[in-house]
Amino acid sequence: MRVTDFSFELPESLIAHYPQPERSRCRLLSLEGPTGALTHGTFTDLLDKLNPGDLLVFNNTRVIPARLFGRKASGGKIEVLVERMLDDKRILAHIRASKAPKPGTELLLGDDESIHATMTARHGALFEVEFNDPRPVLDILNAIGHMPLPPYIDRPDEDADRELYQTVYSEKPGAVAAPTAGLHFDEPLLAALREKGVEMAFVTLHVGAGTFQPVRVDTIEDHIMHSEYAEVPQEVVDAVLAAKARGNRVIAVGTTSVRSLESAAQAAKRDLIEPFFGDTQIFIYPGYQYKVIDALITNFHLPESTLIMLVSAFAGYQHTMNAYKTAVEQKYRFFSYGDAMFITYNPQAISERP
């Protein structure tokens, strides 16, 4: 399959730079997987679409202020984007500089350049950086870091983004991008869903900066997926198996929840799904056999991205591309701060190719 098969024309004006004032008031495009039928509504329509006993699986990762500015002690400006916190003193990061720093290079970080760090090693495209500071890494990031807004949100981060670019249920710091489907859930909607009898479970996948990396090959099968850390604890496994046993649906909130659950299912030795704690490089594209998910809540994704490929594998290629064409025509808002989709599984998708 060619990467260009997943291209579509998107006017710049449809890229959302700010979220809706009220999280759950965004628009919702529903796609019925088996038929391709589309319906237009608002996000709170989920209350009618979900049944008592259905299981929503959220990603409870919390975005860290992962972008740091500063300079090398020798003078050149640098920008650091944390990919992963290794421990209380060290990070793995992307570094943008006129000349890549060598191991041993001293860095002065923060607007006042008061934080001292050392680049200690290089791992492929990533740099290992150690802070020379008594505080834990997370405290340093909270003090001097900027929220790592995606590259297509063409504005500086603002103080408000520290909360707006978080899900209301975020709990475990470690992501450098928000699991954006979850941004639409507010406390009143969550309470109403619980009241209806909808079950909820939480996985953790710390979204890495690799999520924004373009696919740089022509053929999908040649793409090597970036690695991210995921946790699917026993209570999530129990909730999934219980939902399946009683004939209810497992509904993933976002592609990161999909990748977590499907990683746990792939690694399972005996059951449909078993606990999973570790790095995943799962790459889902047309031809993939879904094992766990019955429905998906997700935002609108970039052309030629691995995420639109994941959606195509779930709903079918033609249904997905037609839904995106309709979304553009109907002026839905795209990407992280944009509108959402509710998609049910298309069992025929596995045999469909572009």
From Swiss-Prot:
Role, per record: Transfers and isomerizes the ribose moiety from AdoMet to the 7-aminomethyl group of 7-deazaguanine (preQ1-tRNA) to give epoxyqueuosine (oQ-tRNA).
Protein name, as recorded: S-adenosylmethionine:tRNA ribosyltransferase-isomerase
Superkingdom of this protein's organism: Bacteria
EC number(s) stated in the UniProt entry for this protein: 2.4.99.17
Family: Belongs to the QueA family.
GO-annotated cellular components: cytoplasm
Assembly with partners or alone: Monomer.
Record keyword Ribonucleoprotein present: no
Organism, scientific name: Salmonella agona (strain SL483)
First-level EC class: transferase
GO terms classed as biological process: queuosine biosynthetic process; tRNA wobble guanine modification
Compartments reported by the entry: Cytoplasm
Pathway participation: tRNA modification; tRNA-queuosine biosynthesis
Catalytic activity reported: 7-aminomethyl-7-carbaguanosine(34) in tRNA + S-adenosyl-L-methionine = epoxyqueuosine(34) in tRNA + adenine + L-methionine + 2 H(+)
Entry GO MF terms: S-adenosylmethionine:tRNA ribosyltransferase-isomerase activity
Entries under InterPro entries matching the protein: QueA, QueA_dom1, QueA_dom2, QueA_sf
Main location as per UniProt: cytoplasm
Keyword annotations of the record: Cytoplasm, Queuosine biosynthesis, S-adenosyl-L-methionine, Transferase
